[in-house]
Amino acid sequence: MDASDTPTHPAPHPADPAATPYGAPTTPPRPLRSRFTVRDVAAAKNRGEKWSMLTAYDATTAAVFDEAEIPVLLVGDSAANVVYGYDTTVPITVDELLPLVRAVVRGAPHAMVVADLPFGSYQGGPAEALASATRFLKEGGAHAVKLEGGSRVVRAVDALVGAGIPVIGHLGLTPQSIHTIGGYRVQGRDEAGEILLADALALEAAGAFAVVLEVVPADLATRVTKELRIATVGIGAGSGCDAQVLVWQDMAGLSGGRTPRFVKRYADLRTILADAARAYRADVRDGRYPTIEHSY
């Protein structure tokens, strides 16, 4: 090939997705707004300003949600289900979650990234919790951690906060305890509501900056929200919480089968992706792809 045959297209900018073979993101864009922090959570509570949280498990999705100004991204142990294909959240490990945390942090320069402490990484007590949480901040780049349980994890929360690690608690339906609570059902009814409130207050006293309330009666969640100085994050807990969180595949309609009652689908991504994949398969089969415009 002589010089006249050499392509003359300008080299793409290093931050341009086209600069990589598969259109994957390279370095995140320079932040134009500051990263959301624990102080912002407290300020929003004081102003009565609601905020949103979504799960994320990879850099590309994290970048999309960061662009949409979702302030908090949770690398949840729900990755056990939606990434690794486990039936419950119980099997996932710290080592399986850490690469996902790193990816989300790289993709989201503005969001607070929260890492779930998986089952078996903190139940042994404060020392185990501190070792696990430290890995997520030091090796993963997370900005906070989340753990399930009330009074039984208060000592662990106190140790984490004392070490400078921001903590979100999680009450109500706690999926890591699914074998104990006997299934996915509403928690906190009747006298159990008083126990949940006491647990929430105990987490607040231990230094947690927020608490997730999952699948609890809306009136109970509203009461807890009013009683606490820290933020409440609802998932199946009504509109009275300070914030809301959803698994992004549920929110975007990518999950298959029935979704929980509390999920609102904002798109039908499963159908869109399936249709796109079928169209691609048909084009390849019938010789319609690639064409000259897709060739060098």
Curated annotation (Swiss-Prot):
GO terms for biological process: pantothenate biosynthetic process. It holds the Pfam family Pantoate_transf. 3-methyl-2-oxobutanoate binds at residues 77-78, 116, 146. Its EC number is 2.1.2.11. Binds 1 Mg(2+) ion per subunit. Keywords: Cytoplasm, Magnesium, Metal-binding, Pantothenate biosynthesis, Transferase. It is found in: Cytoplasm. Pathway: Cofactor biosynthesis; (R)-pantothenate biosynthesis; (R)-pantoate from 3-methyl-2-oxobutanoate: step 1/2. Residues 1-33 are annotated as: Disordered. Its cofactor is Mg(2+). It catalyses: 3-methyl-2-oxobutanoate + (6R)-5,10-methylene-5,6,7,8-tetrahydrofolate + H2O = 2-dehydropantoate + (6S)-5,6,7,8-tetrahydrofolate. InterPro entries: Pantoate_hydroxy_MeTrfase (IPR003700), Pyrv/PenolPyrv_kinase-like_dom (IPR015813), Pyrv_kinase-like_dom_sf (IPR040442). Its main location: cytoplasm. SUPFAM superfamilies: Phosphoenolpyruvate/pyruvate domain. Catalyzes the reversible reaction in which hydroxymethyl group from 5,10-methylenetetrahydrofolate is transferred onto alpha-ketoisovalerate to form ketopantoate. Belongs to the PanB family. This is 3-methyl-2-oxobutanoate hydroxymethyltransferase. It comes from Frankia casuarinae (strain DSM 45818 / CECT 9043 / HFP020203 / CcI3). The gene is panB.
